[in-house]
């Protein structure tokens, strides 16, 4: 028997049958979480064809994209289109017998935060959802990937998908993560190295001592943003940290079933002599806090660096892309990144809206105030995260520093709700995408870790968070 990667093992164990000689298989899907934005047409397709949902208990419907996050919760959406989406979503949940986490549900939140809170993500699973950041679940030793609306309809009706197998990429991250650096900095470093299409057609497996040292929530950040390099899957072999993290969550097995599951999950790893199609090596020794300066997550650099000079790029297409990015971002080639003034600071999203992220933010903000010209917004990834942050006293620190403390939702990660930036606004953001207009038409986004966002809010401009923290904190 030939050696296999973990990705290959997961796909093989879920393959119902081969469909051709080009790598297409019929794949069984264990779980899916759907939101109000990408699923309406899929349910309409079921209704038109008179089809039922094959296994309603394997799906969760969750409102997160269009709901307001202002402090006073309301079941009504401010946007009429958003209200139609939510109303139809509620109707679909009732008619097809699928559990719904509505806006006022104490379990509501961003789908990729809620799923693991509820124990819906288990090692060895294959999970598909109508959101590209479904790769997040690789942090648990599961294969997660995003799908389109027509695929959602097929999945609802059959519990399967036509899937094309990917090539494999091994990303080895060695060394100790430097002071004030995080998983966000690792993934931005990876993006800077391989580009926004460097993993297109691949499933990434992250390995190495730096990965083992990351918390489970840090691993989620890493896998979440792997899709920004084009990867349609990102996996980390599960270990004791993962097993301890998921133990006791609502949908997890208990008693003897838990022990049996542990035995199976402990075997989930790539074979020692497995061959990957591509390998990338990163040493954390010289890693510094990272920020993006452009309009793609791979247009990034260390906070101690400068905005690049397009004329130094020999590839004409890349040079044109640099010129376009600097024009949109209103930046001058050669300027120090730490001199870029901001108007907004946003912390949240499925990338960095978990309790560990908020603790890092509180460490920076405690005893400090944000700059008078900066509007700061913190949106917890779920209602459960919000409650925990309040119980730990973090929310008081945020409010005292001048941040708005909101309810859970996707919020300012994308301009799809009332949390939208205006043209010319510049935001330090703990999110995953800095595309043109991502946070609002004409708005400018700089991606970075939550701690870096907090530091920028205090300084009023991009700044090295290390200057605000003492080594060893």
UniProtKB/Swiss-Prot annotation:
Its cofactor is [4Fe-4S] cluster. Pathway: Amino-acid biosynthesis; L-leucine biosynthesis; L-leucine from 3-methyl-2-oxobutanoate: step 2/4. Binds 1 [4Fe-4S] cluster per subunit. GO terms for molecular function: 3-isopropylmalate dehydratase activity; 4 iron, 4 sulfur cluster binding; metal ion binding. [4Fe-4S] cluster binds at residues 350, 410, 413. InterPro entries: 3-IsopropMal_deHydase_lsu (IPR004430), Acnase/IPM_dHydase_lsu_aba_1/3 (IPR015931), Acoase/IPM_deHydtase_lsu_aba (IPR001030), Aconitase_4Fe-4S_BS (IPR018136), Aconitase_4Fe-4S_dom (IPR036008), IPM_dehydratase_rel_enz (IPR050067), IPMI_cat (IPR033941). It catalyses: (2R,3S)-3-isopropylmalate = (2S)-2-isopropylmalate. Its EC number is 4.2.1.33. CDD domains: IPMI. GO terms for biological process: L-leucine biosynthetic process. Pfam families: Aconitase. Keywords: 4Fe-4S, Amino-acid biosynthesis, Branched-chain amino acid biosynthesis, Iron, Iron-sulfur, Leucine biosynthesis, Lyase, Metal-binding. It comes from the Bacteria. PROSITE patterns: ACONITASE_1, ACONITASE_2. PANTHER family: 3-ISOPROPYLMALATE DEHYDRATASE, HOMOACONITASE, MITOCHONDRIAL-RELATED. Catalyzes the isomerization between 2-isopropylmalate and 3-isopropylmalate, via the formation of 2-isopropylmaleate. Heterodimer of LeuC and LeuD. Belongs to the aconitase/IPM isomerase family. LeuC type 1 subfamily. This is 3-isopropylmalate dehydratase large subunit 2.
